[in-house]
C-alpha cells in the first residue's frame, strides 16, 4: 500500500459544535496520522481557490459564505491510501445518505453544514494542502 497525504478540513459548523476532538480521534483511530494541523479563518479569495470547481454553480456563493463564516481546522492527514480511507471515513456529502459510523452519518446535521471536507483525489489534495500549509509546516 502506498503512503499518501491528503487534505482534511473541519468546517465552521464542526468547530462551532465542538467536534474537533471527536473528529481527530476518529481519524487517528483509523490508523491515519495528523502531519499538520491549524485553525484558520478562511478569506473569500482562499475559499474561491478551494472550491474553484464549483464556480458558476447555483450553490457557490452560499458555499463561500458558509466556509468563511467562522474558523475551520485544516489538517494534512497521512497514511496508507489516505485519500480513499478519509473519503470512506467521512461518508456521503448528504448526511441522510451517509452510513452510520461515518463522520457525516453520525455528526452532520444537513447537506449544507456537513462538518468536514476531505480531498477526493491525490492531485486535488496536493493543491488544497498548498493553500493552507507551506512544506516546512508538514511533519514527516
Curated annotation (Swiss-Prot):
Single GO MF annotation: metal ion binding
Cofactor: Mg(2+)
Cellular compartments per GO CC: cytoplasm
Reactions catalysed according to its record: a 2'-deoxyribonucleoside 5'-diphosphate + ATP = a 2'-deoxyribonucleoside 5'-triphosphate + ADP; a ribonucleoside 5'-diphosphate + ATP = a ribonucleoside 5'-triphosphate + ADP
Main location: cytoplasm
TM stretches of this protein: none
The protein's role, per its UniProt record: Major role in the synthesis of nucleoside triphosphates other than ATP. The ATP gamma phosphate is transferred to the NDP beta phosphate via a ping-pong mechanism, using a phosphorylated active-site intermediate.
Name of the protein this chain belongs to: Nucleoside diphosphate kinase
Organism: Metallosphaera sedula (strain ATCC 51363 / DSM 5348 / JCM 9185 / NBRC 15509 / TH2)
Native organism taxonomy: Archaea, Thermoproteota, Thermoprotei, Sulfolobales, Sulfolobaceae
Gene that this sequence comes from: ndk
Amino acid at each position: 500500500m502506498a503512503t499518501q497525504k491528503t487534505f482534511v478540513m473541519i468546517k465552521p459548523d464542526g468547530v462551532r459544535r465542538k467536534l474537533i476532538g471527536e473528529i481527530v480521534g476518529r481519524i487517528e483511530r483509523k490508523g491515519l496520522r495528523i502531519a499538520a494541523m491549524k485553525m484558520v479563518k478562511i478569506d473569500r479569495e482562499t475559499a474561491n481557490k478551494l472550491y474553484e470547481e464549483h464556480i458558476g454553480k447555483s450553490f457557490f456563493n452560499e458555499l463561500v459564505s458558509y466556509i468563511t463564516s467562522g474558523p475551520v481546522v485544516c489538517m494534512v492527514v497521512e497514511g496508507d491510501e489516505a485519500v480513499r480511507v478519509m473519503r470512506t471515513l467521512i461518508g456521503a456529502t448528504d448526511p441522510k445518505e451517509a452510513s452510520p459510523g461515518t463522520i457525516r452519518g453520525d455528526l452532520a446535521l444537513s447537506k449544507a453544514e456537513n462538518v468536514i471536507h476531505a480531498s477526493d483525489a491525490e492531485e486535488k489534495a496536493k493543491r488544497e494542502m498548498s493553500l493552507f500549509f507551506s512544506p516546512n509546516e508538514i511533519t514527516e
